[in-house]
Swiss-Prot record:
Protein name, as recorded: Alanine--tRNA ligase
Gene: alaS
PROSITE patterns in UniProt: AA_TRNA_LIGASE_II_ALA
GO MF annotation terms: alanine-tRNA ligase activity; aminoacyl-tRNA deacylase activity; ATP binding; tRNA binding; zinc ion binding
Catalysed transformations (reactions): tRNA(Ala) + L-alanine + ATP = L-alanyl-tRNA(Ala) + AMP + diphosphate
Keyword field: Aminoacyl-tRNA synthetase, ATP-binding, Cytoplasm, Ligase, Metal-binding, Nucleotide-binding, Protein biosynthesis, RNA-binding, tRNA-binding, Zinc
HAMAP family: Ala_tRNA_synth_B
Cofactor(s) required, per the database record: Zn(2+)
One of the Pfam families matching this protein, by short name: tRNA_SAD
């Protein structure tokens, strides 16, 4: 069976057993900061197992894409060198949320694996493990399924602590846990290894293909296991492993999924396809890189982006090792999309984007790869012992972009190891330097702990009545705030919007009788809204009723900018591609700032396209509509959700232009798109690797920006004695005239230099049969001095020349040595001495060198070095 057929058979089998087919979740875990990447099928169901989320089904089946290449689950260094380690793999899984338990889970697994209708694996090839004390599972396997006792293995606490076992699963030190049962396939006696639980279990003969986890306990802090009221099941079967079994091969790299990728990799690199480890690395890495980029990850220097960069660069290095010339890695994306695009359509829809990102990263790394490898080879040649020092590993990382594991990979090929501890010390020192150079403000919200929640009135009003339920000063709870005191006011009800989703918090004032509190900002902690500000008159007391009034003009201007960010977000996806994801935003009354994932600068013509699309939607003047619904319904309607945002059971869906823009958003917005009036982008640039930023203005601010630009055009026209209509022609004429004058000036300078050369040649002194000339020609630039040195070398014939000039407040130096002397005297060596004398640097070829410095007063002293330099070298 082909891998695609196995995947579909698994999903169809469990659908027939009443399971709901659930699509693979993103490789970016949603709302789980503990995970770098999705690494198991159960990740997307974590809240279901914890009881925090209820879904419309209690049985589920999925084929989950997974990555293990960072953090705790890191297989990167072994990939390519073993039969089963991968950065990307598919986990087939069936799940029960308080529905069926051990008997059904075991029966389902055995039926699918062994029945003729499905995989038809020989039963005598299958071994089973259970947790040592799980008699229930053992009896089901032996008495009901019929697995003989000689192929059953009980596994106890083999990891040095209670319940620390290969056959006991825990989510952490406390929480849901339970025993598991695993199914192993015996590849036969011609492969070394022993059954699970034996001393030889790490061999490759017996390979785990299925794991059933039975979540039946809750472990408390005292280590006691308490039965869960509704036990659940989490299972996993690696698609690559079971494909190897069914296709009668031992290594995962021999299955159909990899054969086409290996062939494509060999073709792109220009090498043979004969099982080299480096080729396996490339074939594996194209899968993880392709899927990560499709899910919105871009190469960067931190977090998920850095893991992606590490994988790409490891693949590039292995391709380079196989003889690749130029960029090759991106060329394999087409084969990946052809192989897996039916099951994962994002590979096809984003193929061009994935290729562009990989090609750009390859080209960037190529600039430093060769130089970095050369430096590493030099360091390894001088190495005493078999450990590469941490400072060498850090230098390669910091200067040449070599991730630590890439250097470790190269060291491994030479039977060397790296000093990881030393590398981490260097990294810590760098982080400390960065911390010392930064100043961090206090997070005031973290000081304020409020149990009560605030009812928000602001979607429908900018004024409202509330009651003071808490007061804070300097982070401490107080009973009252007096005149002139700064603090935080918490109300039971408020029309003030709290900073969220990039929109700044509202400003305004609170009135409590004679007391007034000017609100300078509004934030939120938990469900409480914090009004930050100062008492300008009277005193505020807990329990007092207040009149809350938002600065409606400021809020209105802010709301227009917020609505414009939604239109811009969709426009970006239309113009640049669906890979664009919001990475951050700041929306206030003056302008909007929108950060998004993209790998290159936005072109001027694309900026115009973005403005045209947004302004077209503004002119349509369609209503801005909101709807409260559940998260699944919202996503089914195409609503975009932001990665990392936590959404409750009920979400607010905001639609603009019908279905032009549909996003989950709790912010304040325009009533109609026409309220925005006008949209104008004022800047675009990069803020981090793979992240771009657009700043824009709307409405009156956009009009003011255009008016200011119009005034600048008028002023420019006046300067060239023209008008708006002929400004371009006038400017072109001025620039052309300037170019002509510069050319004439260069010609005059060349003539002057030539004349000076005739005079200077007479000033040369003879040193051991050679002519040595050192001269100062202030006002000449480097280009003029170079031409003059060439002229003097021809005139003098057998010479050492050093010329210097004070030019625009700095020292310019040029040194020359005729070729007949360049084996004895190097112009670059002379330049290093002279440049150092004027506080600068320089270097070059043996016959010609350039340099400079900042110490003009030392120029004559530097020129005086020419004669002793020649005397010592000749």
């Amino acid at each position: 069976m082909k891998s695609a057929e196995i995947r579909e058979a698994f999903l169809r089998f469990f659908e027939e057993q009443g399971h709901t087919r659930v699509a693979s979740s993103s490789l970016i875990p949603n709302n789980d900061p503990t995970l770098l990447f999705t690494n198991a099928g159960m990740n997307q169901f974590k809240d279901c197992f914890l009881g925090a989320e209820k879904r419309a089904y209690t049985r589920a089946v999925s084929s989950q894409k997974c990555v293990r290449a960072g953090g705790k689950h890191n297989d990167l260094e072994n990939v390519g060198y073993t039969a089963r380690h991968h950065t990307f793999f598919e986990m087939l899984g069936n799940f029960s949320f308080g529905d069926y338990f051990k008997r059904d889970a075991i029966t389902f697994a055995w039926t699918f694996l062994t029945s003729e209708q499905w995989l038809n694996l020989p039963k005598e090839k299958l071994w089973v493990t259970v947790y040592a004390t799980d008699d229930e599972a053992y009896d089901i396997w032996t008495k009901e399924v019929g697995v003989p006792a000689e192929r059953m293995v009980r596994i106890g606490d083999n990891k040095g602590a209670p319940y620390a076992s290969d056959n006991f699963w825990t989510m952490g030190d406390t929480g849901p846990c339970g025993p598991c049962t695993e199914i192993f396939y015996d590849h036969g006696p011609d492969i070394w290894g022993g059954p699970p639980g034996s001393p030889e279990e790490d061999g490759d003969r017996y390979i785990e293909i299925w794991n059933n986890v039975f979540m039946q306990f809750n472990r408390t802090a005292d280590g006691v296991l308490h039965p869960l009221p509704a036990p659940s099941v989490d299972t996993g079967m690696g698609l690559e492993r079971v494909s190897a079994v069914l296709q009668h091969v031992h290594s995962n790299y021999e299955i159909d999924l990899f054969q086409n990728l290996l062939a494509a990799a060999a073709k792109a690199i220009g090498c043979s396809n004969d099982g080299q480890a480096s080729l396996k690395v490339v074939a594996d890495h194209i899968r993880s890189c392709g899927f990560l980029i499709a899910d919105g990850v871009l190469p960067s220097n931190e977090g998920r982006g850095y893991v992606l960069r590490r994988i790409i660069r490891r693949a590039c290095r292995h391709g380079n090792k196989l003889g690749a010339k130029g960029s090759f890695f991106y060329q394999i994306v087409a084969a990946l999309a052809a192989e897996m695009g039916e099951a994962f359509p994002e590979l096809k829809s984003q193929q061009a984007h994935i290729e562009r990102v990989l090609k750009a990263e390859e080209e960037q790394f190529a600039k430093t790869l060769e130089q970095g490898l050369r430096i590493l080879e030099q360091d390894l040649a001088q190495l005493k012992g078999d450990v590469v020092p941490g400072d060498v590993v850090f230098k390669l990382y910091d200067t040449y972009g070599f991730p630590m594991d890439l250097t470790a990979d190269i060291a491994r090929e030479r039977e060397l190891t790296i000093d990881e501890a030393g590398f981490e010390r260097e990294m810590d020192a760098q982080r400390e330097r960065a911390r010392s150079a930064s100043a961090f403000g206090m997070d005031y919200n973290s000081l304020v702990k409020v149990d009560s929640a605030t009812e928000f009135l602001g979607y429908d009003a900018t004024e409202g009545q509330g009651k003071i339920i808490a007061l804070y000063k300097d982070g401490q709870s107080v009973d009252q705030l007096g005149e002139g005191e700064e603090g935080v006011v918490v109300l039971d009800r408020t029309p003030f919007y709290a900073e969220s989703g990039g929109q700044v918090g509202d400003t305004g004032f609170l009135q409590a009788g004679a007391a007034r509190f000017d609100v300078r900002d509004t934030t939120k902690t938990g469900g409480a809204f914090l009004h930050h500000g100062v008492v300008t008159s009277g005193a505020l007391v807990i329990g007092s009723p207040v009149e809350a009034k938002v600065d409606a003009d400021v809020q209105h201007a802010t709301s227009l900018n917020h609505s414009a960010t939604h239109l811009l977000h969709e426009a970006l996806r239309q113009v640049l591609g669906e890979h664009v994801q919001q990475k951050g935003s700041l929306v206030d009354s003056q302008r909007l700032r929108f950060d998004f994932s993209h790998f290159e600068a936005v072109k001027p013509e694309q900026i115009k396209q973005l403005e045209d699309i947004v302004n077209r939607e503004i002119r349509k003047n369609t209503p801005v509509e909101t709807e409260l619904t559940d998260i699944e319904t919202a996503k089914a309607k195409g609503a975009m959700a932001l990665f990392g945002e936590k959404y409750g059971d009920t979400v607010r869906v905001l639609s603009m232009g019908g279905d032009f823009s549909v996003e989950l958003c709790g912010g304040i917005h325009a009533k109609r798109t026409g309220d925005i009036s006008l949209f104008k982008i004022i800047s675009e640039g990069g803020v981090a690797s793979g992240v771009r930023r657009i700043e824009a203005v709307t409405g009156a601010a956009a009009l003011a920006y255009l008016n200011a630009a119009e005034e600048q055009v008028k002023e420019a026209a006046q300067l060239v004695k023209g008008n708006r209509d002929n400004l371009i022609d006038k400017l072109s004429a001025v620039l052309e005239r300037n170019r002509q004058l510069e050319k004439q000036l260069e010609q005059l300078q060349a003539k002057a230099a030539s004349a000076a050369g005739d005079d200077l040649s007479n000033a040369a002194v003879e040193v051991k049969g050679a002519k040595v000339l050192a001269a100062r020609l202030d006002g000449q630039d480097g280009k003029a001095l170079l031409a003059l040195v060439d002229q003097l070398k021809n005139k003098l014939g057998h010479a050492v020349i050093l010329l210097g000039s004070e030019h625009e407040g700095k020292v310019v130096l040029v040194a020359g040595v005729t070729k007949d002397l360049s084996s004895q005297l190097k112009a670059g060596d002379l330049m290093k001495q002279a440049a150092a004398a004027v506080g600068g640097k320089g270097g070059g070829r043996p016959d010609m060198a350039q340099g400079g410095g900042v110490d003009v007063a030392a120029l004559d002293q530097a020129l005086a070095l020419a004669v002793p330099f020649a005397e010592q070298g000749l």
